[in-house]
């Protein structure tokens, strides 16, 4: 199965249909709820709902998801019934397969209950397809429409001294690159408050996004938050709340992060944890919001300006 552990949860909905063709007298039986086996539409609705809830047991590589809503509705025509299934969840992946499975099994249930009333060649299913979906990467974009200049500053005495390689900062650079940020300034600093303050103020004149990596913990040398928080003119607390909530589901140590985010003039500053896992998890949680911020606020600074 595909690993969806690093995908943030979001509201998702999918709508699917299936069409069952049948002789007109069978469609009338559906309207009356009067087949040999009982009310076919009511029975099929229950079957479709159960199918949505158990899709992961039927389709081998489909992820189990909490189903918050599963509905099956019908449109009865002269010689066919259109089955429409709607499924909703809040999760890391979509419910397209759940909606398709619900529509399919509802159709098969109706087929089973109508077959005593007609010849086999008079019943067939068609046009089982997804009608629409909402949520996830198709709705919450993770790639910029236009490039945005970003800077990544790694704060670590040991990395700056060459005693340990940087992995967290490079993972942030990689994520930003994949999201369309360009150019990206990358720099390593020791945990020195004045050096960090001066660099961030200078970079804020040319870079719309400044990401610091490291110095958000509770150690004596963790000076990033104490240095940058007083500089923030407009705080954006929701970014780090999202990052901590996402991280807390993966490690209890996420609660120790003091990270902050906000604007210095028109430059967004975000302080990330210094561990590879903490930085990666934080980026996974906040990237859709980052992309939205910079797609909306097109007057943010960029070297050379925007055309």
Positions of PLM-derived features:
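C-terminal binding/interaction regions
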Residues: 1-39, 46-57, 68-148, 159-160, ...
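Glycine-rich phosphate/diphosphate-binding loop of Rossmann-like nucleotide-binding domains
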Residues: 112-116, 140-191
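Short amphipathic alpha-helical segments
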Residues: 164-166, 222-226, 283-284
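A glycine- and small-aliphatic-rich helix-loop capping segment at beta-alpha/alpha-beta transitions
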Residues: 171, 226-234, 286-292
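N-terminal small/polar loop signature for handling phosphorylated ligands or for N-terminal nucleophile
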Residues: 174-232
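Conserved acidic residues
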Residues: 208, 253, 267
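Short, acidic/small-residue loops that bind anionic groups at enzyme active sites
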Residues: 229-254, 293-303
């Amino acid at each position: 199965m595909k690993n969806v552990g690093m995908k943030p949860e979001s509201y998702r909905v999918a709508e699917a249909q299936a069409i069952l063709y049948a002789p007109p007298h069978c469609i009338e039986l559906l309207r009356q709820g009067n087949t040999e086996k009982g009310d076919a539409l009511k029975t099929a609705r229950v079957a479709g709902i159960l199918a949505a809830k158990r899709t992961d047991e039927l389709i081998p590589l489909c992820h189990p998801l909490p189903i918050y809503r599963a509905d099956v509705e019908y449109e009865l025509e002269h010689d066919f019934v259109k089955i429409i299934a709607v499924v909703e969840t809040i999760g890391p992946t979509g419910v397209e397969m759940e909606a398709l499975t619900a529509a399919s099994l509802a159709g098969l249930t109706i087929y089973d209950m109508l077959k005593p009333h007609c010849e086999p060649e008079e019943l067939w299913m068609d046009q089982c397809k997804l009608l629409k979906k909402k949520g996830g990467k198709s709705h919450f974009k993770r790639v910029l429409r236009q490039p945005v200049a970003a800077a990544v500053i790694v704060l670590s005495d040991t990395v700056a001294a060459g005693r340990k390689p940087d992995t967290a900062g490079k993972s942030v650079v990689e994520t930003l690159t994949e999201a369309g940020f360009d150019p990206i300034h990358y720099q390593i600093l020791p945990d020195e408050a004045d050096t960090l303050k001066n660099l961030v103020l200078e970079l804020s004149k040319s870079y719309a996004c400044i990401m610091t990596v490291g110095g958000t913990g509770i150690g004596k040398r963790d000076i990033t938050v104490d240095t940058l928080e007083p500089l923030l003119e407009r705080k954006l607390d929701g970014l780090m709340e999202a990052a901590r909530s996402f991280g807390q589901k993966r490690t209890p140590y996420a609660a120790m992060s003091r990270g902050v985010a906000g604007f210095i003039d028109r430059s967004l500053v975000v302080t990330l944890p210094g561990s590879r896992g903490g930085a990666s998890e934080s980026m996974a949680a906040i990237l859709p919001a980052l992309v939205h911020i910079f797609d909306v606020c097109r007057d943010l600074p960029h070297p050379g300006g925007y055309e």
